[in-house]
């Protein structure tokens, strides 16, 4: 099997729900899972954690409009993010 190139050494996968957000931060081969609420101060806490960890890209999956407040905070804090749906 051919090995793929690493694009982001420090990245996050985020599953956004109405009242909860689950984040998997990956740094190299190490991962850390955290759960956050969806209030503004909780979104800011999550953003500070990701930025403090050196996160280079956050990819979030969301059904419905629940990703929008988080995306707006990421944009204000200059944390690169994308919305993806499988």
Protein language model annotation of sequence segments:
Residues 1-86:
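Phosphate- and other anionic-substrate recognition elements at nucleic-acid/protein interfaces
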